[in-house]
């Protein structure tokens, strides 16, 4: 168990009334969750730079106009491991507009076999679909 706070940058990519998210599953809790794309902020890196790097690595595209929406503190457990994150939430857009036409966006991340999907904002309201920042 790590006793450090992990700073991350996540990107809100909008397409009409949908946002792009990855889906996860906590086997121990039996719960599914969603989270926007992004990842760890490296030492000396700004949040917008981290989001650019993560999208370049994971989605193979460049982003434009990343701007900070909020900074959140999140504590939770994943697979029984306590987590503590400072989450920099940025809104951005893809330079390659074809991503907005796809039902799924491939992710190139070692150790993670999945994709991102466009989900309606209403999908997260009042239901079992947990949104983790």
Regions found by a protein language model. Give the residues of each.
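Conserved N-terminal beta-strand and adjoining loop/helix that marks the start
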Residues: 1-20, 40, 66, 91
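Nudix hydrolase/Nudix homology domain
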Residues: 29-33, 99-133
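Active-site-adjacent beta-strand/loop module that shapes the phosphate/pyrophosphate-binding cleft
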Residues: 74-104
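Short connector loops at helix/strand junctions that flank enzyme active sites
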Residues: 6, 14, 36, 63, ...
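Conserved Nudix-box catalytic region and its N-terminal flanking loop in Nudix hydrolases
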Residues: 18-57
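A short coil-to-beta-strand element that immediately follows conserved catalytic motifs
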Residues: 62-71
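Short, well-ordered beta-strand micro-motif
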Residues: 13, 89-93, 117-122
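Short loop segments at secondary-structure junctions
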Residues: 16-18, 25, 92-98
């Amino acid at each position: 168990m790590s006793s450090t706070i992990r700073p991350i940058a996540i990107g809100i990519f909008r397409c009409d009334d949908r946002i792009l998210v990855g889906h996860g599953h906590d086997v121990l809790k039996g719960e599914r969750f969603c989270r926007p794309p992004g990842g760890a902020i490296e030492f000396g890196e700004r949040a917008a730079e981290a989001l650019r790097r993560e999208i370049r690595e994971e989605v193979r595209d460049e982003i434009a106009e990343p701007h900070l929406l909020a900074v959140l503190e999140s504590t939770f457990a994943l697979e029984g491991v306590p987590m503590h994150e400072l989450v920099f939430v940025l809104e951005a857009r893809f330079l390659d507009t074809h991503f907005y036409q796809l039902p799924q966006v491939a992710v190139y991340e070692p150790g993670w076999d999945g994709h991102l999907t466009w989900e309606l904002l209403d999908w997260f309201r009042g239901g079992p679909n947990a949104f983790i920042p």
